[in-house]
């Protein structure tokens, strides 16, 4: 399974990217929320991924935040919602908006997403109720490079949850190294 890609952003054409990792180009489908926050072509990018193996294809879906990927995976568990539909939902609504719509049972917000009809919207509300917790309703930290991704993973390994880890890396400089970043993040978490 491929859980994360770090490489050079070689091409981007909504909703697909080509990420060059060590001379191998990976095609990755992303929601528009991720697409709009990507660096310019030629820059390094780190994407958290979800790998789908089908009879006729192997597909990678990429996200800048762990929150978005977790929501995507939660959507895939719903009967009748495939990867394309889940991607469409996350392109039409932010994670916070989706969580709010589910909490308020607002089918009207979901119906505005292309490909989501009234019945599908009602099924989404029913099956997601109580499953998009408060952590998913909060915007996650955008992981801009491999060091920040490693810092988040280290904090999670030390027992912090994704929300705490994401909050701890937000104030860190983009060019901070892994060991210094972990120290700074731990200091911030200790306050």
UniProtKB/Swiss-Prot annotation:
CDD domains: UBA_RuvA_C
Gene3D superfamilies: 5' to 3' exonuclease, C-terminal subdomain, DNA helicase RuvA subunit, C-terminal domain, Nucleic acid-binding proteins
Stretches for region Domain II: 65-138
Any one GO molecular-function label of the UniProt entry: four-way junction DNA binding
Lipid metabolism among keywords: no
Main location group: cytoplasm
One GO-annotated biological process of the protein: DNA repair
Region feature Flexible linker, mapped onto this chain: 138-142
One cellular component (GO) term of this entry: Holliday junction helicase complex
InterPro entries cross-referenced by the UniProt entry: DNA_helicase_Holl-junc_RuvA_I, Hlx-hairpin-Hlx_DNA-bd_motif, NA-bd_OB-fold, RuvA, RuvA_2-like, RuvA_C, RuvA_C_sf
Region spans: Domain I: 1-64
Ranges for region Domain III: 143-191
Subcellular location: Cytoplasm
Keywords: Cytoplasm, DNA damage, DNA recombination, DNA repair, DNA-binding
DNA repair in keyword set: yes
Comment block on domains: Has three domains with a flexible linker between the domains II and III and assumes an 'L' shape. Domain III is highly mobile and contacts RuvB.
Protein family according to the UniProt entry: Belongs to the RuvA family.
UniProt function note: The RuvA-RuvB-RuvC complex processes Holliday junction (HJ) DNA during genetic recombination and DNA repair, while the RuvA-RuvB complex plays an important role in the rescue of blocked DNA replication forks via replication fork reversal (RFR). RuvA specifically binds to HJ cruciform DNA, conferring on it an open structure. The RuvB hexamer acts as an ATP-dependent pump, pulling dsDNA into and through the RuvAB complex. HJ branch migration allows RuvC to scan DNA until it finds its consensus sequence, where it cleaves and resolves the cruciform DNA.
Record text on subunit structure and interactions: Homotetramer. Forms an RuvA(8)-RuvB(12)-Holliday junction (HJ) complex. HJ DNA is sandwiched between 2 RuvA tetramers; dsDNA enters through RuvA and exits via RuvB. An RuvB hexamer assembles on each DNA strand where it exits the tetramer. Each RuvB hexamer is contacted by two RuvA subunits (via domain III) on 2 adjacent RuvB subunits; this complex drives branch migration. In the full resolvosome a probable DNA-RuvA(4)-RuvB(12)-RuvC(2) complex forms which resolves the HJ.
Protein name (record): Holliday junction branch migration complex subunit RuvA
Lineage of the species this protein comes from: Bacteria, Pseudomonadati, Pseudomonadota, Betaproteobacteria, Burkholderiales
């Amino acid at each position: 399974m491929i859980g994360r890609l770090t490489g050079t952003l070689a091409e981007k054409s909504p909703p697909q990217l080509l990420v060059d990792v060590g001379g191998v180009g990976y095609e990755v489908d992303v929601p528009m929320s991720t697409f709009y926050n990507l660096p310019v072509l030629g820059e390094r990018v780190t994407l958290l991924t979800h790998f789908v193996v089908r009879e006729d294809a192997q597909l990678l879906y990429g996200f800048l935040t762990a929150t978005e990927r977790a929501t995507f995976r939660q959507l895939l568990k719903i009967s009748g919602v495939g990867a394309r539909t889940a991607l469409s939902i996350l392109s039409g609504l932010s994670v916070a908006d989706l969580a709010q719509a589910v909490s308020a049972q607002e089918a009207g917000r979901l119906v505005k997403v292309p490909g989501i009809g009234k019945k599908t919207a009602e099924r989404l509300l029913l099956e997601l109720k109580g499953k998009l917790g408060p952590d998913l309703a909060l915007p996650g930290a955008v992981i801009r490079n491999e060091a920040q991704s490693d810092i988040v993973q280290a904090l999670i390994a030390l027992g912090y949850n994704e929300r705490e880890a994401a909050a701890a890396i937000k104030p860190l400089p983009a060019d901070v190294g892994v060991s210094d970043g972990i120290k700074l993040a731990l200091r911030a978490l200790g306050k």
